[in-house]
Amino acid sequence: MSGSSGPQAQRGPCPFALLLLLLLGPSSVLAISFHLPVNSRKCLREEIHKDLLVTGAYEITDQSGGAGGLRTHLKITDSAGHILYSKEDATKGKFAFTTEDYDMFEVCFESKGTGRIPDQLVILDMKHGVEAKNYEEIAKVEKLKPLEVELRRLEDLSESIVNDFAYMKKREEEMRDTNESTNTRVLYFSIFSMFCLIGLATWQVFYLRRFFKAKKLIE
């Protein structure tokens, strides 16, 4: 028994944890690239949860050689129109902000120039939440070992998933309350409509009865 326990103790980290890191880690980073014609505007929208760090890097390749006074304006806003980041004549840079509420955020690139100018190539890489954290810097500050850094990252990722499930549960409860409220209103409206129809039918019966009596068609 003692001979077999030694190698097992030296196996290292849990294979399941490493598998989660391999599956969830690389797939969480996504760069978007597109072509931006001159005098055009393209926007990207994304819903992001509350109190999350959002970081991004962008690079705009100008293939015109500076002809036509080509300039590109980058602006990031929330659904209320508040400007979170703005850059005139953007070429390459980074940005960061923290969300205050769950909201829809919009990243817009607008190109302005004159003449026939080739399309610009825009590359945008946005990260938020766990993806936006600089774990290399955290490791230096807290003097963490590589395995401890990966475990910290896995812990943050698990917390993020739990928060997502909690938000979805809250949304489900809100939708259920809305459905129940709607069903109650429909029921009350149906009852009101039924009484209106009964009242209208009763009025028509009495009206026709008086009409026929006036015409002496009935006694």
Curated annotation (Swiss-Prot):
Residues 207-219 are cytoplasmic. The modification Dimethylated arginine is found at R171, R176. A motif (COPII vesicle coat-binding) lies at residues 211-212. It comes from the Eukaryota. Residues 147-178 are annotated as: Required for TMED10 and TMED2 cis-Golgi network localization. The keyword Membrane applies. It is found in: Endoplasmic reticulum membrane; Endoplasmic reticulum-Golgi intermediate compartment membrane; Golgi apparatus membrane; Golgi apparatus, cis-Golgi network membrane. Predominantly dimeric and to a lesser extent monomeric in the ER. Monomer and dimer in ERGIC and cis-Golgi network. Forms homooligomer (via GOLD domain); the assembly is promoted by direct binding with leaderless cargos and may form a protein channel that facilitates cargo entry into the ERGIC. Forms heterooligomeric complexes with other members of the p24 family such as TMED2, TMED7 and TMED9. This is Transmembrane emp24 domain-containing protein 10. It comes from Bos taurus (Bovine).
